[in-house]
Amino acid sequence: MYKRIKGTEDIFGDDIKYWYYIENVVKETVRLYGYSEIRTPIFEATELFIRSVGEETDIVQKEMYTFEDKGQRSITLRPEGTAPTIRAFIENSMMATGLPKRLFYIGPMFRYERPQKGRQRQFHQFGVELIGSPSPLADAEAIIVADRVLKNLGLLNYTIKINSIGCDKCRANYKNALKEYYSDKLDYVCDDCKRRYNTNVLRLLDCKVDVEYIKDAPKITDYLCDDCKHHYEETKRLLDNLKIKYVEDPLLVRGLDYYNGVVFEIHHGDLGAQSAVGGGGRYDKLIKELGGSQTPSLGFAMGIERLIIALKNEKIPVEEIKNNEIFVAHLGEQARIEALKIAEDLRDNGISVVFSTMERGLSAQLKHAARLKCKLCVIVGENELERNIVILRNMETGEQIEIERDYVVGTAKEWIEG
C-alpha cells in the first residue's frame, strides 16, 4: 500500500471547511483593497531563489527541493511566493499598465524541514504584494490588510510585531556593531552562527539555538539614518491613527535577504514556541536584482495551516459547506429515470443533491443518506410515480410527507431554509 510522503497531508472531510473559509475571507478582504490574483508555476529556475532569498539563508542552504530536469536545468519547487510573483511582474511587463500594482496569491510552497504541527514540507500560503510605491502609506496598507484579514477570520489572540532594518547604509553600521558584539562569543555559538558571522551577520538574529545572546544584541533602530527613521515613524503614525495595535521588536530582521526598511511578523498566542503565522516587509531592491527597473515594493504572506490551528484553538465557528443537502432515493426502473430528473431540477435551483447510483433497497439508501448527513431525502417509487407524487423525508426528525411531483423543488427549499 502506498502512503503519503513524510511532511505532506491529505486534506479532506471536516478540515476542508477551514480551507474554504480562509480562502474566501482572504479573497474578499484583499478585493476591498484592489488586489488582483496571480497564479505562478510551483517550480522555477533555482537561480531565482538564490538571487532573491539569499544564498546564505537557511532556505537556500538547507530547505529547498532542487532537482535537475531532463534538459539539465536546475529547478526548484517554490519555497515562498514573492520571488515568483516578482519574476512574473518583470517577465510580463506589468509595469507598462501603471504603478502601483496590487497582486495576491494562494498556493502550495515546499521546504525540506522537520515536520511538526502546522509546519509541513508541503505547506500553503496566501501572500499580498504591493509593487511600485516608496511611501509609508504602502507599508501601513500592507499591515492594515494583514490585520483586517485576521479580524475578518474572527481571530483575537494575535500580535503584530514591527521593526525597521533600514537601508544599506544603516545595515552596514549595524552589521559592524553586531560583529563586534559577537566577536567574543564565537567559541560558544552554534556551527551555523559561526558560518553566518562571516557570510551574513544579520542571520545570527534568526538563530533558534543561541537565543540568550540575541536578547542582549545591539538594536538596529539605534543605527537608522534620518530617512529610514522618518519612514518608520510615519508608518507607525499611520497605524496609530487607525488604532492598529502593534508591538515594536527591535531585533526582528526576517529570514529572507531581500528585505529592507519596515518589516513585520504576525504571531498567535496559541501556537506555542513556533508562534509565527506570517510576516513581510519592504523589498525595494528585489525587482532590480531580478532584472527589472528599480521599483520600491513590499508584501507579506501567511501560512494557511497555521491559521487553521489558530482558528481551532480559538474555537472560531466555521460554517459547514453546503454539500449533501438532499439525497434522492429511488425504487424501480421508471422511478430511477424520474428521480434523476428531480435531482437535476433541484440542482438547477442551487441545491446540493446526492443521487443514489447503487441498486439498493430503500433501507440501505436511507442509511447511506444518514451517513452523508443529508438534511432531506426525496423518495421516488413506482407506486408513487403512478399517482404523480413523491415522498419527502426529514432525515433529522423522521417526518415525511407526500407531495405532488411539481412541488418538489419549492417544498424542498422551504424545508432546507427552515
UniProtKB/Swiss-Prot annotation:
Instruction: Write out the catalysed reaction.
Output: tRNA(His) + L-histidine + ATP = L-histidyl-tRNA(His) + AMP + diphosphate + H(+)
One GO BP: histidyl-tRNA aminoacylation
An example of a GO molecular function for this protein is: ATP binding
InterPro entries tied to this protein? aa-tRNA-synth_II (IPR006195), aa-tRNA-synth_II/BPL/LPL (IPR045864), Anticodon-bd (IPR004154), Anticodon-bd_dom_sf (IPR036621), His-tRNA-ligase (IPR015807), HisRS-like_core (IPR041715), HisRS/HisZ (IPR004516), HisRS_anticodon (IPR033656)
The listed locations are: Cytoplasm
EC number, as in UniProt: 6.1.1.21
Keyword annotations from UniProtKB, A to Z: Aminoacyl-tRNA synthetase, ATP-binding, Cytoplasm, Ligase, Nucleotide-binding, Protein biosynthesis
UniProt xrefs under HAMAP family: His_tRNA_synth
Q: What is this protein called?
A: Histidine--tRNA ligase
Source organism per UniProt = Thermosipho africanus (strain TCF52B)
